[in-house]
């Protein structure tokens, strides 16, 4: 346990941020998985609908600093390519 007051506070804020980031990353993984399942099933309409919502979640996570902007761009690109193959 830290002795310095500011470090005690940083431990608390880091834990709160970790839990928040964990939640966002979990929802991202779920969104990507559901898109991939729709794409694998060949459901064009549902896949395109999920592509939009997943892209939005990726952009939001990148703007909040949960994931790097380049990682979001790479994932969006891969998902778009998968959608275009349908």
Curated annotation (Swiss-Prot):
GO MF entry, a single one: small ribosomal subunit rRNA binding
Highest taxon of source: Bacteria
InterPro entries: Ribosomal_bS20, Ribosomal_bS20_sf
Parts forming coiled coils: none
GO cellular component: cytosol; small ribosomal subunit
Keyword Ribonucleoprotein found: yes
Keywords: Ribonucleoprotein, Ribosomal protein, RNA-binding, rRNA-binding
GO biological process, one term: translation
Disulfide partners: none
One Pfam match: Ribosomal_S20p
Family in the record: Belongs to the bacterial ribosomal protein bS20 family.
Role according to the record: Binds directly to 16S ribosomal RNA.
NCBIfam families: S20
Protein name: Small ribosomal subunit protein bS20
Species of origin: Rhodococcus erythropolis (strain PR4 / NBRC 100887)
GN (gene name): rpsT
């Amino acid at each position: 346990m830290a002795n310095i007051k500011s470090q005690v506070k940083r431990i608390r804020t880091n834990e709160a941020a970790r839990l928040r980031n964990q939640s966002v990353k979990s929802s991202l993984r779920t969104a990507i998985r559901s898109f991939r399942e729709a794409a694998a099933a060949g459901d064009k309409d549902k896949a395109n609908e999920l592509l939009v919502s997943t892209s939005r979640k990726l952009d939001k996570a990148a703007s909040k600093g949960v994931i790097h902007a380049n990682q979001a761009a790479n994932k969006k690109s891969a998902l778009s390519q998968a959608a275009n193959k349908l």
